[in-house]
Structure formats: structure tokens, C-alpha cells
Amino acid sequence: MESHFNWYGVPRLQKASDACPRESCSSALPEAREGANVHFPPHPVPREHFSCGAPKPVAGAPALNASLMDGGALPRLVPTSSGVAGACTARRRPPSPELLRCSRRRRSGATEASSSSAAVARRNERERNRVKLVNLGFQALRQHVPHGGANKKLSKVETLRSAVEYIRALQRLLAEHDAVRAALSGGLLTPATRPSDVCTQPSASPASASLSCTSTSPDRLGCSEPASPRSAYSSEDSSCEGETYPMGQMFDFSNWLGGY
């Protein structure tokens, strides 16, 4: 039996002389001649028939006969499984190396930004602690310098200047004290002598004094030998030690330190 379909599944036209009489076909196909086969262009097959999924019927297209496909006219399409269909639909183009480099650069930039922000926070915390300790040190220094505890708060520069002047004044005071001590130990300076009646009580009558002198032990000479001036100085020094320097002649340290 001769097949009436071509390779594309489109019905093949018969000869004009076999299909219909000349007079009936001449009106339908005026250009057809006797003995000539008239072929139509193949019917376009939609792209969906070649996709991974099942073929979808197209409106207006003739349906394919399964017997003709078995006969060898068209190869039968192998039904695809769901996994293959999913793999086909999920197949994507792999990312380019430029995109990979950009993504790595973005990730590295984010990590660097987070690490730099943490470093800045730690540096700011250290700076705040340093400033706090410096302020506490200046506050303690103001309590030791003259006029540091006044109502007027001294600035840092004024506090340092007052501390330097106070240290220099203390050094001068120590130098003067050392010089006076060295002069006294070398005998260059002697304390002023004063009459004995200033420090001692009035003595008894001359008779009682001579009686007391003669009543001493016989091995001593009594009062015939005059007393040495050194012993008199030592007794005077021991009895009048608190009145050697009057209070008016003492150095006024409070007025001297008040200028600083």
C-alpha cells in the first residue's frame, strides 16, 4: 500500500488525473498540468516539539498517526523521565571567572570593613582611657601645688607652671638649710650670748654663797677657782635653749610660700 504522507507527516497529493477529472480540478488548480505532481511546502514544526518536555499539540496542525510512526515515517520520541526533565530545566550557564572574582572581592571587602571598624573601636577606647588617666593626674597635682585647691580651676598649663615653681622654691629652701648647717658645724657662726640673770633666778646673799662653797668636800678647791667660760656657756645653752632665737627673728615660711 502506497503511503499518502511524506516524511514530514503531511498528506501527499495524488496526481491531478487520478484524483479528479480535468474539468473538476481545473477550476481548483488552474496552473496544474496533466502528468505533473503538485507538492506543497512542508508544514513548519513548532520549537516545542524539540524541547525536553512532552510535545504539546499545536492548534491547526494535523495530528500524527502512531501507525505511520511505527512504519518508519517518523522516529518515535522516547518519553523522558521527570529527573531528566528537571535536569534539563535546571541546566544553567556556569558563572564566568569575572563574576567569581567580583563576588570574592565583595566578600573580602565586607570582612575588611568589619575588621577595620573593630580596630577603630578599640583605638577609640584606648584613647578615652588615656585622656581619663591624664585628667586624674592633673587633678591630683592641683591638690599639692599652692593655690591649686582654690575656687578657680587651673588649666593644665598653669598647673604645670605652678608645680615647676613650687619644686624650684623647695630646692632653694633645702640649699639654704644645708648651707646654714655646714656653717654651724664649721664654727663660722656662734650663737649670741646673753646675761645669766635673764635665764636664771636671783642668787642668794654672798654669805650664803660662800658658806655653800666652803661646805663642799675637802678634796675640791671650792669657789676659789673661777668657773670655766665653756661650762657657763653650756649651762646657759641648756637652760635657755628655747629662747636663743626670738620668734620675731625666725623665717616666715608661710609668707614665703604664699607667693607661689
UniProtKB/Swiss-Prot annotation:
InterPro entries: bHLH_dom, HLH_DNA-bd_sf, MASH1/Ascl1a-like. Keywords: Cytoplasm, Developmental protein, Differentiation, DNA-binding, Neurogenesis, Nucleus. The keyword Cell cycle does not apply. Pfam families: HLH. It comes from the Eukaryota. GO terms for biological process: cell differentiation; chorionic trophoblast cell development; in utero embryonic development; negative regulation of Schwann cell proliferation; negative regulation of T-helper 1 cell differentiation; negative regulation of T-helper 17 cell differentiation; negative regulation of T-helper 2 cell differentiation; negative regulation of transcription by RNA polymerase II. Induction: Transiently repressed after nerve injury. The keyword Cytoplasm applies. Its main location: nucleus. Residues 85-126, 191-239 are annotated as: Disordered. GO terms for cellular component: cytoplasm; nucleus; RNA polymerase II transcription regulator complex. Residues 118-170 form the bHLH domain. Residues 110-121, 200-218 have a biased composition (Low complexity). One of its GO terms (molecular function) is sequence-specific DNA binding. It is found in: Nucleus; Cytoplasm. Expressed in Schwann cells in the peripheral nerve (at protein level). Also expressed by endothelial cells (at protein level). May be expressed in neuronal precursor cells. Efficient DNA binding requires dimerization with another bHLH protein. Forms heterodimers with bHLH transcription factor TCF3. May not heterodimerise with bHLH protein HAND1. Transcription factor. Binds to E-box motifs 5'-CANNTG-3' in the regulatory elements of target genes, probably as a heterodimer with another basic helix-loop-helix (bHLH) protein such as the transcription factor TCF3. May bind both open and closed chromatin, acting as a pioneer transcription factor to allow other factors to bind and activate lineage-specific genes. Required during post-implantation development for the generation of some differentiated trophoblast cell types. This is Achaete-scute homolog 2. It comes from Rattus norvegicus.
